[in-house]
Amino acid sequence: MDYFPIFCQLRTKPCLLVGGGEVAERKARLLMEAGAILTVNAGRFTPQFEQWQRDGQLTLIAGDFDPALLTGKWLAIAATDDSRVNQQVLAQSEARCIFCNVVDAAQQTGFIMPSIVDRSPLMVAVSSGGSAPVLARILREKLEALLPQHLGQVAHMAGHLRQRVKAHFPTLSLRRRFWERLFAQDRLAQSLANGDTTQAQQQVDALFSAAPMDRGEVTLVGAGPGDAGLLTLKGLQQIQQADVIIYDRLVSDEVMSLVRRDATRIFVGKHAGHHCVPQEEINQTLLDHAREGKRVVRLKGGDPFIFGRGGEELEALAAAGIAFSVVPGITAASGCSAYSGIPLTHRDHAQSVRLVTGHTRQDGQLDWSCLAAAGQTLVFYMGLSQAATIQQRLLQHGMLPDTPIALVENGTTIRQRVVSGTLTQLETLATRVASPSLIIVGDVVTLRPRLNWFRCEAASA
């Protein structure tokens, strides 16, 4: 973060603007809209500045910049066409610990002014840190079209309701749910937009009288294979509404950065063959937080119903009578194969695909004869530590030694690595990658050189 975003309360605060041209005019409008007591210093002023002074909206001081003008000021803006003067204003301001903005000089300024979308009291600010002001402007224009004008009225009503909500709902979680319901009311916003405050008040009163919102619930959310862009829209909504996030090690840092900032985060990561947190303890953690009336998200890498123990956790919730729902995710097989240029099925190479876990509760549960059959693609999850066994069993049951294979490490992320070779090399290649990795076995791997589009580190045996 190059710049710390902050909104300043400037109402009745003395501020200095140095510059009297059209650019300075735009800054003056913003400062006056914010309620600042504005002094403007310049050699010449546009007619608009002179009109503002006649109207008593600001004070004009003609002449060269005098550092004494900064005395008692909270904020300064240098908006002249003379860079020497602008830098003098900046230096004198910083010497007095006064924030100073130099217009159109992102690298030589004390603070920058973002593009804004004004739906007062709701304000949206967009900034590129001076690197791409046109991009910031384009984003502001998109937001202007997206955010209706009456949002400000909704925000005003919310401000008047704060004390009533605090008195009515005893916990932060309940208050948050009330606000989410309120802001989801399209009819309320429409009533305010139409000026029908009576109807709007009736809709608000109905929310206070609605069914209790203190029942806890758990949502099982698939976080996808790593790339945060592959998280579903519904999954994003759930993690941004949750009171508690219980997540494992396969959830990427990029996805976790999207979680609501004030949500409680509980890590229950597990490694193959070593359960950092026993499954029974994870189940109990879900139950405990849901029973406290919280909105809990169990966030799992990939899809929770594909080798994610999602079914086991939901059985525990169902037995306890806890409400739950499931948001599927893109499983690792789909994500890693797509980002590696390896289609899992292809009319010329594979008419079916099998998703197989490299770890089972008992040896021998897998039908290796079926797995070794031609015309299919095998995808092994959590198979690195069992690579030697996988290689041995497939060869024993008739799979050709030169069957192409690929190991995908950290699939779909910028850290993705793909190591390829043949079945006889699987045990050796497995030592060259780290978990989390996926093993893909089948003729479709030969398509990778032509179909790979995601550029990352790759290696061939």
From Swiss-Prot:
Keywords attached to this entry: Cobalamin biosynthesis, Lyase, Methyltransferase, Multifunctional enzyme, NAD, Oxidoreductase, Phosphoprotein, Porphyrin biosynthesis, S-adenosyl-L-methionine, Transferase
Positions annotated to bind NAD(+): E22, V23, G43, R44
NCBIfam families recorded: cobA_cysG_Cterm, cysG_Nterm, PRK06136.1, PRK10637.1
InterPro entries, alphabetized: 4pyrrol_Mease, 4pyrrol_Methylase_sf, 4pyrrole_Mease_sub1, 4pyrrole_Mease_sub2, CobA/CysG_C, NAD(P)-bd_dom_sf, Siro_Cobalamin_biosynth, Sirohaem_synt_dimer_dom_sf
Function recorded in the entry: Then it catalyzes the NAD-dependent ring dehydrogenation of precorrin-2 to yield sirohydrochlorin. Finally, it catalyzes the ferrochelation of sirohydrochlorin to yield siroheme.
GO molecular function list: NAD binding; precorrin-2 dehydrogenase activity; sirohydrochlorin ferrochelatase activity; uroporphyrin-III C-methyltransferase activity
HAMAP family for the chain: Siroheme_synth
UniProt modified residues of type Phosphoserine: S128
Protein name: Siroheme synthase
GO biological process: cobalamin biosynthetic process; methylation; siroheme biosynthetic process
Catalytic activity as recorded in UniProt: uroporphyrinogen III + 2 S-adenosyl-L-methionine = precorrin-2 + 2 S-adenosyl-L-homocysteine + H(+); precorrin-2 + NAD(+) = sirohydrochlorin + NADH + 2 H(+); siroheme + 2 H(+) = sirohydrochlorin + Fe(2+)
Region (Uroporphyrinogen-III C-methyltransferase): 216-461
Record keyword Ion transport present: no
CDD domains: SUMT
Segments for region (Precorrin-2 dehydrogenase /sirohydrochlorin ferrochelatase): 1-204
Residues at the catalytic site: D248 (proton acceptor), K270 (proton donor)
SUPFAM superfamilies on file: NAD(P)-binding Rossmann-fold domains, Siroheme synthase middle domains-like, Tetrapyrrole methylase
EC number: 2.1.1.107, 1.3.1.76, 4.99.1.4
Family that this chain belongs to: In the N-terminal section; belongs to the precorrin-2 dehydrogenase / sirohydrochlorin ferrochelatase family. In the C-terminal section; belongs to the precorrin methyltransferase family.
